[in-house]
Amino acid sequence: MVLTKRIIPCLDLKDGRVVKGTHFVDLRDAGDPVELAERYNEQGADEVVFLDITASKEQRGAILSVISRAADQLFLPLTVGGGIRTIDDIQQLLRAGADKVSINTSAIKDPSLISDGAVRFGNQCIVVAVDVRRSTAANPDATVIHLPDGTTCWYEVVIYGGSTPTGIDAVRWVQDAEERGAGEILLTSMETDGTKNGFDLAITAAVSDAVSIPVIASGGVGTLADFYDGVTAGKADACLAASVFHYGEFTVRDVKTYLAGRGVPVRL
């Protein structure tokens, strides 16, 4: 059976509201994540990611109420990330109606969160998000990655939104995460994030080769061809994007039609 490649819009939420602008002119409420997610659902999105960037723990109630509304109204898988530090946090989100949770910095700080979460809730619920940056610092144990310009580097895991280097080799970390029970890897390269120049294909392919669980490519989409490159040269199982969808440069349906026309299996 050929697995279809998934297209996943991502919405950044703060206090239960969407923070990045959106182009949909006929929305009743452009800040309502459930209404936006419904729009993506209609366009054929395979799932939606809500990334909660609310700083404080006190405001977690907002995201929980959004999730329960979304779970009631949407019939597509919902992944929620941001601020998840404990098994109790995971349980609250899943109980509210999330299908999966995405853990990032907390997984590096406490890798047992991956294994405990996988045992308690199932591997399929645990997405490990990995933010990476290129490094040429001496690291004899790191996985050497060959870049398109002929140079080499290794990729370092960065945490706290990309601001803090860890010294950890990205390829080793994703293998470790898989061994601990992660069901999926959400990979964002800080080299390409926000550039609209396409995914960082070198590390995406290296990570996809290094693990047997699905890899979601994130960071850098600007054109329809970038999605194609992500699932072919990048070997990713899914592509995540935010601004190109929010600002209406193209729809999820446009992406899938483009991919299908080039022989990529997608759910239309």
UniProtKB/Swiss-Prot annotation:
GO terms for biological process: L-histidine biosynthetic process. The keyword Amino-acid biosynthesis applies. Pathway: Amino-acid biosynthesis; L-histidine biosynthesis; L-histidine from 5-phospho-alpha-D-ribose 1-diphosphate: step 5/9. The active site is at 12, 131. Disulfide bonds: none annotated. GO terms for cellular component: cytoplasm. NCBIfam families: hisF. This is Imidazole glycerol phosphate synthase subunit HisF. The gene is hisF.
